[in-house]
Amino acid sequence: MQQDKVNLLGLNQKAIEDFFISIGKKKFHARQVFKWIHKKGVIDFDAMTDLGKNLRHKLKDKAQITIPKVVFSKASKDGTHKWLIDVGGSAVETVFIPEEGRGTLCVSSQIGCTLNCSFCSTGKQGFNRNLSAAEVIAQLWIAARTLSKTDGEHDFTVTNIVMMGMGEPLMNFENVVPAMDIMMDDLAYGLSRRKVTLSTSGVVPRIYDLLEQSGVSLAVSLHTPNDMLRNEIVPINKKYNIDELLEACKLYAQKGPHKHITFEYTLMEEVNDNLSDAEELVALLKSREVPAKINLIPFNPYPGTPYKKPSNNRIHRFKEFLQHNGFVTTVRKTRGDDIDAACGQLAGDVMDKTNRKQRYLKKLGDTNAN
């Protein structure tokens, strides 16, 4: 039966080699198929012209290459591209952000999120399930094929990956790590560890595991230097406080690919954007001796949120203070907000997740969505 077949899409190189050995075939055949899937975008075994007829027949009997369907894709006026992808009746979003000299793909790891950060629209959906490794890597496969100019063969339009979409990737460690392995494999997408960034709200034990098993670039959603406030807006802080988090970050910076940690800081008016917050942040990072870059993210309002985006003056003042104290600081530009693709808007209209697919089809005028 179809559901009993192994989906080769989500297998990293070692796993696909193990599968081929299990069906009595050679490792080099596995590498051929792996390259066809990810480098060339081919998912039909019969189109893999360097495979023998008997092998193709066996693969059709034992395996499949299943790509989730795209419910819709839409480009923003600023060039940002968004895909809504059907994953077993639910939907996740993937966003491509073009910039001069690079193209960044923001990838989701869960349907919804377990952490319920108070300012995050995705968390308001609740949590459905983890994505499989195939569903994670499918987002890159789809983007690479859509954006490619070489008739399906990956041409590195996507130069950077950020695991910053829907969900907390370290809460789906077992599926996210193999997917990132594929992203970095030279037979697939060939991205370096420096070009793949995982963003976490602070699942501290898994940060150590990530360093040992993957070593991609790390970004941490800090949002405040104050434990009391962080307990409120990032509830996982009650389990792993700022001291524990920064201890893990310090080790990661020493051994990771960038020798620093990027700290993400969502600025919310009169919540964490005061000069006193900036002073406390500087004191914290200097006292813990964590090499840091700081990425300030002006809050993107969504229906029902009590939080507000700070004025440009307040954002500038916060940034200037950090820079004056020696920290490389950037302000994330709002991109794709006309298609609900900006950071923090990945929950669309913040409605029940079970209706997301129907809502988006309705937006496109599909009468079958009702």
From Swiss-Prot:
The keyword Metal-binding applies. GO terms for cellular component: cytoplasm. The active site is at residues 93, 343. S-adenosyl-L-methionine binds at residues 167-168, 199, 221-223, 300. GO terms for biological process: rRNA base methylation; tRNA methylation. It holds the Pfam family Radical_SAM. It catalyses: adenosine(2503) in 23S rRNA + 2 reduced [2Fe-2S]-[ferredoxin] + 2 S-adenosyl-L-methionine = 2-methyladenosine(2503) in 23S rRNA + 5'-deoxyadenosine + L-methionine + 2 oxidized [2Fe-2S]-[ferredoxin] + S-adenosyl-L-homocysteine; adenosine(37) in tRNA + 2 reduced [2Fe-2S]-[ferredoxin] + 2 S-adenosyl-L-methionine = 2-methyladenosine(37) in tRNA + 5'-deoxyadenosine + L-methionine + 2 oxidized [2Fe-2S]-[ferredoxin] + S-adenosyl-L-homocysteine. PROSITE patterns: RADICAL_SAM. Binds 1 [4Fe-4S] cluster. The cluster is coordinated with 3 cysteines and an exchangeable S-adenosyl-L-methionine. Its cofactor is [4Fe-4S] cluster. It is found in: Cytoplasm. The keyword Glycoprotein does not apply. Keywords: 4Fe-4S, Cytoplasm, Disulfide bond, Iron, Iron-sulfur, Metal-binding, Methyltransferase, rRNA processing, S-adenosyl-L-methionine, Transferase, tRNA processing. Its EC number is 2.1.1.192. CDD domains: Radical_SAM (cd01335). [4Fe-4S] cluster binds at residues 113, 117, 120. It is an enzyme of class 2 (transferase). InterPro entries: Aldolase_TIM, Elp3/MiaA/NifB-like_rSAM, Methyltransferase_A, RlmN_N, RNA_MTrfase_RlmN, rRNA_lsu_MTrfase_RlmN/Cfr, rSAM. Disulfide bonds join 106-343. Residues 99-337 form the Radical SAM core domain. Its main location: cytoplasm. Specifically methylates position 2 of adenine 2503 in 23S rRNA and position 2 of adenine 37 in tRNAs. m2A2503 modification seems to play a crucial role in the proofreading step occurring at the peptidyl transferase center and thus would serve to optimize ribosomal fidelity. Belongs to the radical SAM superfamily. RlmN family. Reaction proceeds by a ping-pong mechanism involving intermediate methylation of a conserved cysteine residue. This is Dual-specificity RNA methyltransferase RlmN. It comes from Francisella tularensis subsp. holarctica (strain LVS).
